[in-house]
C-alpha cells in the first residue's frame, strides 16, 4: 500500500522486487469472475460457496498464509495470473508461485472471515478522495490478514480509495462465522464511486446495491449480468432453509456452474470451493469434476 497501487504493473513489479529480489519473474494483473453465497445448516454451521469462473483454463494454487501479527488463512490463486500454469517445471515458475499470497482470489481466515472477488461490467473504479489507495488484490490480502468479522472487513475497506485492477471492475462477497454476508461495492452511478456494503445471501456478476433493477439472462449495462445464476442458487437454498448443509452447498454451486464459452470472460468454472466459516477449512473441486473433492485444513 505504501508503494502506491494506481499503476497495476508498477505495483506488481514492486511486489516482485520485494518478495523475489533479482529473480526474473513476469506476473500479470489478475482477472476474476464468479458466483458466491452463504449457507447455514441445522446446527448453525456457516459456509461460503464460491465458483471461480474464467474463460481461460488455469491451474489452482492452494495458498496458506501466516502473516506476522495477522490472522492465518487459506485460499486459492489462479496460476495463469502468475504467468505459469506448471510451476514445478522451472525455477522461474517456482519463484512465481511464491507470489500466490498477492494473487489470491478467495479465502477464509482463522476467525472465519471469508472473501471472494467477482468481476463487474462497469468502468473500473479509480477513486481519488485523498485517502490511502488500495487495489483489488491488496483488498483480499487486507481482509484475510486483518479482519475478525465482516464488520471489521467493511470498516477496513471503507478507509481506502479503491483502484480496480486489470482494466475491469469488481466487488467482494464477504462472510463471517456469524453468517453476516455482505457485498462490498463502489457505486457506479456516483461520480465519487461511493462505498456500499449490501447484506445479501447470494451474488454473481451484478451490483447487489442495485439488485432489484437487474434482470436475468441479459446484460444490464453497467449494473452487470449473471442474475440467472443467482436465481439458480436461491432456488436451491430456498428449498433447504434451516438445513443448508455441505451437500446443499455443493448442489447450489453445481446449479450455478458454467461450461466454457470463449466469448464470455465469466464462463468456464475453474474451481468450486466451500469455505467453512465456523471451523475454518476449505473443500474444492476443479472444472466441474463434482465427484473429485479435495479438503484442506487451515
Residue ranges and their predicted role:
Residues 141-144, 154-157, 234:
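Non-transmembrane alpha-helical segments in soluble domains
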Amino acid at each position: 500500500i505504501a508503494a502506491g497501487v494506481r499503476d497495476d504493473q508498477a505495483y506488481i513489479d514492486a511486489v516482485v522486487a520485494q518478495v523475489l529480489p533479482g529473480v526474473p519473474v513476469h506476473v500479470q494483473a489478475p482477472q476474476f469472475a464468479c458466483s458466491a453465497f452463504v449457507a447455514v445448516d441445522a446446527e448453525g454451521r456457516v459456509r461460503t460457496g464460491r465458483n471461480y469462473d474464467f474463460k481461460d483454463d488455469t491451474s489452482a494454487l492452494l495458498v496458506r498464509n501466516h502473516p506476522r501479527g495477522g490472522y492465518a488463512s487459506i485460499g486459492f490463486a489462479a496460476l495463469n495470473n502468475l504467468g505459469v500454469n506448471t510451476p514445478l517445471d522451472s525455477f522461474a515458475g517456482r519463484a512465481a508461485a511464491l507470489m500466490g499470497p498477492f494473487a489470491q482470489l478467495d479465502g477464509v481466515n482463522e476467525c472465519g472471515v471469508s472473501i471472494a472477488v467477482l468481476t463487474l461490467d462497469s468502468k473500473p473504479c479509480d477513486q481519488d478522495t485523498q485517502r490511502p489507495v488500495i487495489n483489488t488484490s491488496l483488498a483480499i490480502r487486507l481482509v484475510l490478514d486483518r479482519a475478525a468479522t465482516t464488520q471489521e472487513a467493511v470498516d477496513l475497506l471503507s478507509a481506502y480509495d479503491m483502484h480496480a485492477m486489470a482494466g475491469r471492475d469488481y466487488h467482494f462477497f464477504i462472510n463471517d462465522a456469524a453468517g453476516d454476508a455482505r457485498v462490498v461495492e463502489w457505486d457506479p452511478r456516483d461520480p465519487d464511486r461511493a462505498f456500499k456494503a449490501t447484506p445479501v445471501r447470494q451474488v454473481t456478476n451484478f451490483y447487489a446495491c442495485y439488485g432489484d433493477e437487474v434482470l436475468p439472462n441479459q446484460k444490464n449495462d453497467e449494473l452487470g449480468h449473471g442474475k440467472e445464476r443467482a436465481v439458480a442458487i436461491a432456488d436451491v437454498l430456498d428449498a433447504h432453509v434451516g438445513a443448508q448443509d455441505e451437500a446443499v452447498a455443493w448442489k447450489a454451486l453445481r446449479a450455478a456452474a458454467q461450461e466454457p464459452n470463449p466469448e464470455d470472460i465469466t464462463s468456464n468454472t475453474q474451481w468450486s470451493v466451500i469455505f467453512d466459516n465456523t471451523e475454518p477449512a476449505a473443500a474444492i473441486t476443479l472444472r466441474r469434476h463434482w465427484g473429485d473433492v479435495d479438503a484442506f485444513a487451515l
